[in-house]
Curated annotation (Swiss-Prot):
Enzyme class: oxidoreductase
InterPro entries linked: Amino_oxidase, Carotenoid/retinoid_OxRdtase, FAD/NAD-bd_sf
Protein name as catalogued: 4,4'-diapophytoene desaturase (4,4'-diaponeurosporene-forming)
Disulfide bonds: none
Name of the gene this protein is made from: crtN
Pathway assignment: Carotenoid biosynthesis; staphyloxanthin biosynthesis; staphyloxanthin from farnesyl diphosphate: step 2/5
Amino acid sequence: MKIAVIGAGVTGLAAAARIASQGHEVTIFEKNNNVGGCMNQLKKDGFTFDMGPTIVMMPDVYKDVFTACGKNYEDYIELRQLRYIYDVYFDHDDRITVPTDLAELQQMLESIEPGSTHGFMSFLTDVYKKYEIARRYFLERTYRKPSDFYNMTSLVQGAKLKTLNHADQLIEHYIDNEKIQKLLAFQTLYIGIDPKRGPSLYSIIPMIEMMFGVHFIKGGMYGMAQGLAQLNKDLGVNIELNAEIEQIIIDPKFKRADAIKVNGDIRKFDKILCTADFPSVAESLMPDFAPIKKYPPHKIADLDYSCSAFLMYIGIDIDVTDQVRLHNVIFSDDFRGNIEEIFEGRLSYDPSIYVYVPAVADKSLAPEGKTGIYVLMPTPELKTGSGIDWSDEALTQQIKEIIYRKLATIEVFEDIKSHIVSETIFTPNDFEQTYHAKFGSAFGLMPTLAQSNYYRPQNVSRDYKDLYFAGASTHPGAGVPIVLTSAKITVDEMIKDIERGV
């Protein structure tokens, strides 16, 4: 069969490879001039920067894409596990290193607060049990009809997840120490949610880091995009770049998706898998006579969106890789207040920031004697933060100064401004324009209880035959391992339909 995949981000690349490995003719259409989507790369002034995701968690999910296609993952990506997850800075003289080794972890916890290990381990155990339930009964399955969700098994297993509790509540149930609470709560921002609003299940990230480890891909995270692109090439997939999709064509008589309009041309296909940002697709790519019924264009703005980010890619003329970790977090003096600012639409003058220094793990990513630094500052998305004008150069200059001041609170970056030789920024406006991410959201639809599992945009269209959706705003959600899972379960359903002649 001839299959179209819209979008050459990690979801589209993984899905296309899986389909092609089953013997089908696959074409990927990508609007930009390179593959990767949000898993993008910037090469500038001799530095190589990952532009989007940077942390490799759940490596088996990465490997599975290649092995499921009959290939050896080691021929495409080079993975290695990190001994230390990150350094965390609470203030200038207060730094802790978070290890994966349990003995070292205990020492770290006890140094923060004697006796805190028991509560922390109880938290990890509870979350791991919830994760296994969620993975088996909710995350790794699709919901094609109401009875797939509304049944006794889902009711019983869902009750065990205690989804009405928020992430903050679960953390505070086990952890009394404010520093350790910050360590756990901050990571919900990795998928763009407010720990006060996100279901308690979304406190799984620290557990995943501890249980499965954190890894690094040689060449940076973009090495995964390159590996997937090579996998697709080896499987005979055709990737068309600079291919802007104008519309998904719906046959009004048979209510099926049978073509796409791309760069002015109508291209016929047997099935279409769309991995572009779902809200933008529902708003702009469906014909007027054939909207997605649950998500018509006029309702898209009313959905809840994850936060965005202001990113800086900084090159400095000194090598500091022996003084920092690969991953680093510098906390705001008012962590809870900063969270409120992000989700209430206000800019912070004292943000918590994430700092990634890729040359710590791969020297080839920066010129000799120099260091590339990636800084992420969570911000409101464009709807909640409608009063923020990201096109205002004076504003972006002010935010850069805020970030440089925050970096300068740790010793290694005290004099960073005098060493800058390269600087690039990426704003919420850029997320919207470059990736068609609605409201510049960095992680798609926010996974609130009302926008999760059965209540999230589904992988198989309920309105039109031969139309499928995958990606961060669809089930099961955002984050690289999760969108790779989205690709897998969506392709599994497509292959079942093909085998049944549906």
